[in-house]
Amino acid sequence: MTDSITAPAPAPTATISSRSITPISTQGNSHDVEKTAPSIPHDDDDDDRTAHEYPTTTEKGQNSDPSKEQDEAGPPVSEDDNLTFPEGGRGWYCVLGGFLCTFISFGYANSAGIFVEYYQNELLQGQSSSNLAWIASFQYFLLFFCGSLTGRIFDTGYYRPMFAAGIFLFLLGQCMLSLSTQYYQIFLTQGIILGISYGCIFQVGVTVPQQWFHRRRASAMGIVAAGSSTGGIVFPVMIKNLIPMIGFGWTMRVIALIAAFCLSLAFVCLKTRLPPSIDVHTPQGWRAVKWFDFSVFRQAEYSFFVLGSALAMLGLYSPFSFCDVWTTTHNIPANGYWLAVLNAASMFGRILPGFLADRVGRTNTLFPHLLAAGILMLVFPLTNNLTGMIFFSILYGFASGSYVSLIPASIGQLGPTSTIGTRLGMAFAGSSLGGLVGTPIAGAILGPDNTNWWGMSVFSGVMVIGGAMNSHEMKP
């Protein structure tokens, strides 16, 4: 009994916790390794890659200096995004695939101005600018609105069948458009069928690359979004020059062949990295799917941002739809090529702000660009000569370009990457209302004789400035 009382207690076992280890920062690598994160199950053959094949970005450790952490890591990561991001590697193939998706979908939709001019002067003479604007507006509306459904499909893991359906609908719509001669036929084929195909293609193109990047996400999305500007350069010039040579029908078929090649290549390049966030292999899983998940709007920052995006959409694309009408009515030289100039400037406005956004914050970059676009829109009627049109096209194209690249990247930082499809989809659905009515309202204000340019400019400019103010409510 005495021995049991007086016997010395055993020495405590030394324990080592992850908190007792000082983070190690490597000076020679731009990606600091400060904490080991669990590996992520992949859906492709990249599972056996070693950590040395490409750098990774992880969540910062708890012992990090908060101020230094914000400076080095850029935008904050959502709390349940404790993931490792490759920041490259196969992700660059996904960026290429996303570029091709936006080239065919948003890029072709950005060619609306050349179609409005051709329909008004040739194929659909007598139709007003407002009536013709409904064709383009329905394309933008469905491109974004379909995201509310396609985003949920993406999160269930069925992005490839959805993408294949988008390819089929695009080729079907384009071939049927080549045979159309009446307004209702063009509205159904170009406005409805092509619009739905854009929604399937665009959603996959802007969502998959975000699973591969966090620190470089805005830069990667800038490259992806540049595809829409590239399409806005190529397609108007192609259409303007091919129609006099081979006719409207064969021009549409040539575009269908180009799209078939580009989208097939994108289909090969795009691969998701994370497992589906919704398990639909059981009846309970399917019942759990909410095709319209309005719960995301409980987050105030998200709701403000979507509202700002919708307001900006009401006026942002008015110059893209009516610039050729403006240059025709004011006898400005190089008519038919100004849409290409706008999109060329927009391409730089989508890439360069993306690199800046990764350093100073995404909304910190988006706000001044949208504000500048709104101010430029207010003075659009002053560009009634060649010099003015050159300056406006370059400045407005660059300022408005950040919208397409930074909107998805900004939404991506508001929640976990595993549900990014749903959050992007619901945001696009909210923005779609602006895309649906914005251009027709601008066309109605413009009037049947295309004379009220000041009214159209004030409406569009005020909407874009309002969108900029709402987007600024979100943290950088």
Mark where each language-model region is.
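C-terminal transmembrane helical hairpin of 12-TM major facilitator-type secondary transporters
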Residues: 330, 336, 340-346, 350-414, ...
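Intracellular juxtamembrane helix-capping segments at the cytosolic ends
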Residues: 119, 191, 198-213, 220-221, ...
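Helix-loop-helix hairpin linking two adjacent transmembrane segments in secondary transporters
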Residues: 215-216, 223-274
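Hydrophobic core of transmembrane alpha-helices in multi-pass small-molecule transporters
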Residues: 99, 103-104, 173-174, 183-200, ...
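Interfacial helix-cap and linker-helix signal at transmembrane-aqueous boundaries
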Residues: 119-120, 153-154, 234-247, 327-328, ...
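Extracytoplasmic gate region of multi-pass secondary transporters
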Residues: 104, 108-119, 297-364, 408, ...
